[in-house]
Amino acid sequence: MKKYILVLSICFAIASQNAEAQNKEKKENKEGKVSAIDHAKAQFDYAFEEFAKVKASGAKGVSPRTTKGDTLVLVASKDWTSGFFSGNLWYMYELTKDKKWLEKAKEFSAPIEQEKTNGVTHDMGFKIYCSFGNGYRLTKDPKYRDIMIQSARTLITRFNPTVGCIRSWDHHAEVWDFPVIIDNMMNLELLFWAFKETKDSTFYKVAVSHANTTMKNHFRPDFSSYHVIGYDPKTGQVTKRNTHQGFSDESSWARGQAWGLYSYTMCYRETGDKKYLQQAEKIGNYILNHPSMPKDLVPYWDYNAPKIPNEPRDVSAATITASALYELSTMVPEKAVLYKETADKIMKSLNKTYKAEPLTNKGFLLIHSTGNLPAKSEIDVPIVYADYYYLEALLRKRKLNK
């Protein structure tokens, strides 16, 4: 009888916690009377209208990326951001179960298929995993599986075993012989997936080598990250350390820190190697305890930008961080509450202050992201990948609450 009462008590406690969490989610996701999901539905419907207008004017891009003035900017499939918009639509299908989003996700994914054999870029994960990866996860369409496997095979052709990394850029040859950027860590998820699907250990070995080499060379003692490490492709030696999109080479570019947190959390999930978990936690500690981090946890574009607080924010860095923290909360029981509540606080800030007004900003969900400030590109604008990791964070939050 005592065991029976104990079981009932535990069940009641869990049910109460779940109900409280779900009510909290509804409350936090509301801005006025519109929930985060309803806001996204309306914005994406508006985005489809704006996309059609731009296409009718002769634009040749396949996917929305950002805005420039009052113009919706589209990109070709080869652009590193081309997979995010269809990824957003796959997430909308997952969040709503409405087949309308399924059909739209298929429509916007299709033009990106040709990238599966594009070997002159490292951005295969961003383009293919965010689009067809989510599509395969949700539909198990064998065609999507084939596209992803081919994409993974294409990606590893850029691996240099002497360096131990996948080459990032082919441009700026006058600056770097073999550049590797922190963003490239995000593409490893495609390789881990390909290993599990094919049992070909080459994918796994390349991913682990890249993760280990990056962990060795990209991070400073305080676990902030350089953006670009230049290698000698013949010897594997480091030749340059730069922060190309940050304030200075020794500064901490906010999105780069977020990529590091997210990717090493993912590497621990895929390998079980605790050194990756420790790395993720240390990067997270650097981010969350940095003296330049604002109270709302939406960082400035660079933690060392000289005119803080009069510097642009980068909402994309915040959404990547929130999504990573939700996952990290499932891996560290003693810090689960801390990580989840911190992610919740970021999402609450985004919903309260950084959400686009309905039927504005060409249908993007969030405002105030910064792409590449040193190049005077995409400053204080909506950017598609900020929306992507925001929706992913909403999904992860929902799953945790349930």
Predicted regions and their residues:
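Glycan-recognition and catalytic cores of secretory/periplasmic carbohydrate-active enzymes
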Residues: Q22-K402
